[in-house]
UniProtKB/Swiss-Prot annotation:
Protein name stated in the entry: Glutathione synthetase
HAMAP family: GSH_S
Bilayer-spanning residue ranges: none
Classification via InterPro entries: ATP-grasp, ATP_grasp_subdomain_1, Glut_synth_pro, GSHS_ATP-bd, GSHS_N, PreATP-grasp_dom_sf
Length: 307
């Protein structure tokens, strides 16, 4: 197969930690031709999708050939693996990738789903599995929810890697001013969730491939921190899935398959769903290292069975 990876500039990739690098190397081991480009390299001339792409040999990291204009219709699979934020440039890239999709190319994850499934709001489809949650921009609503729950976590809807996530108590002085700040004076909604004390034991990143859980790691927060994201100092640990976690995965699977969300990372705290990550989920390297599971190879094998 010919596979194109749309991602951040290769110079920014840390291959020893990066899930996209792991997938590219697994595709190479499967005998596929690997190409890469950034979102700004995508082109549509009329209804013909193209890209100025680089032929790459990702293992060992990395040999890069000269850029070539390629018809996207000539690829079997295109991976959209650009990291958030989901800004204008990101959204326009998904529209250009839809042109390739109409030409018969399998795009992962499906561009329309990348737009529709905000990584915070998408979880609301499965609210029965979540802690009490409120999404609002009105400060009075958020304050009432904080008083009701006592201890809450506030998340920006466009955030990633734990950035901008804060924990507040209802009686905290200056709560109203803080809520005015995070909502930009009630211009933007934020997500408020009941704080789950189980987070001190870690939150679990579960990677689902075509709806099936193929790997997971526990991410334990560092001393004095409640955020467990690896990007803010969390430590990855080996883990196994509990029965409630398997039930969550089973509940999500039909919707993920129907929406074309082939590679997804969900976050679970104390048996409760926190987020559904669809843009460029991480954790492959940690699963492979801690669980001794060839997750990237399994992902490419599953993909080849579907294309």
């Amino acid at each position: 197969m010919r596979q194109l990876f749309v991602l951040d500039p290769l110079s920014q990739i840390r291959p020893e930690k990066d899930s996209t690098a792991a997938l590219m190397q697994a595709a190479q081991r499967a005998g596929d031709d690997i190409w890469s480009c950034t979102p700004s390299d995508l082109i549509a001339r009329g209804d013909e999708p193209m890209a100025v792409a680089l032929p790459v040999t990702p293992d060992p990291w990395i040999a890069v050939g000269a850029p070539e204009r390629q018809s996207l219709a000539g690829f079997d699979v295109i991976w959209m693996r650009k990291d958030p934020p989901v800004d204008e440039a990101y959204l326009y890239a998904t529209h250009l990738l839809e042109v390739a999709e109409r030409a018969g190319v399998r795009v992962l994850n499906r561009p329309s789903a990348l737009r529709a499934w905000n990584e915070k709001l998408g979880a609301l489809r499965f609210s029965r599995w979540m802690a009490p949650t409120l999404v609002a921009g009105r400060v009075s609503e958020l304050m009432a929810f904080a008083r009701e729950q006592g201890d809450v976590v506030l998340k920006p809807l466009g955030g990633r890697a734990g950035l901008g996530v804060i924990r507040v108590q209802a009686e905290a002085p200056g709560l109203k001013a803080l809520l005015e700040l995070v909502t930009e004076q009630e211009r933007l909604p934020v997500m408020a969730q009941r704080f789950l004390p189980d987070v001190t034991e870690g939150d679990k990143r579960i990677l689902l491939v075509d709806g099936d859980p193929l790997g997971a790691v526990n991410r334990r927060p560092s001393e004095g921190e409640f955020r467990s994201n690896l990007a803010v100092g969390g430590q990855a640990e080996a883990t196994e899935l509990s029965e409630p976690e398997r039930q969550i995965c089973a509940a999500l699977a039909p919707a993920l398959r129907a929406e074309g969300l082939f590679f997804v990372g969900i976050d679970v705290i104390g048996g409760m769903l926190s987020e559904i990550n669809v843009t460029s989920p991480t954790g492959v390297r940690e699963v492979e290292r801690l669980m001794q599971e060839p997750l990237a190879d399994q992902t490419i094998e599953r993909l080849r069975s579907l294309v």
